[in-house]
């Protein structure tokens, strides 16, 4: 009865041990990106921007204000990827019966003594303490078998998060301007705009997963872009577009069997869960909107898109 219970318990321990997914929490970047990561980051950004509903801005001249969460950093995975070797080691040895026979040499000593007409004869038999011959016989067959599994664990993750990469911000801003242009919406400077459009990029990075389940293994790289946007009419301070959220995830996955392969590689993009907190349910105090528009960071105003607080202030005061 105990043996019947022990077998499934041992089998379950073997199957479940070292099975899991290690998920780092890196920001993308930190050195030269490889092509797959570039493709995923660009795809998620393009999908999020392309899905923006801008119909309410048709025929208007808009000024864009884009703020991006810090997204540059570095990360590395070390260790992991088990190999069938020897951590759980069992050994069975079947040894044959062995018999050894020894033959020791013997020698005889004779001594004769004569004294006063008396003669004595002494004879002794001795055996040397070293065999002159040994014979070993083995009966039956012998065998030896072993089984082992070496598990390197799921590895160690190290990451470093830095500041926003200006080139990433520039790329994302150019995507936004491209979509606005293709939708027939004019993007102009704040001095010539009748509408302000604010875009907050909350998530713009990658996630790497490693899954180890003995027979099945997988490496997964995901890129996510999550943004919230809204538009304000400068004349009456009304919201032309209430706060809306777009979130997309692009993924690249390699499937392995015993870490041999990959036997399958897949790529895809899909909408993902939105922001943990958004502003879609915020209502103004009273019956009027505020007189001041949100501002963006000064270091986000470069190359003709996005404007600093000082530029917005001068425009509202009528200064050049």
Swiss-Prot record:
Protein name: Adhesin MafA 1
Main location (coarse class): membrane
Species classification: Bacteria, Pseudomonadati, Pseudomonadota, Betaproteobacteria, Neisseriales
Cellular compartments per GO CC: cell outer membrane
Residues with lipid group (N-palmitoyl cysteine): 19
Subcellular localization(s) per the UniProt record: Cell outer membrane
UniProt keyword list: Cell adhesion, Cell outer membrane, Lipoprotein, Membrane, Palmitate, Signal, Virulence
Organism superkingdom: Bacteria
The species this protein was found in: Neisseria meningitidis serogroup A / serotype 4A (strain DSM 15465 / Z2491)
GO biological process: cell adhesion
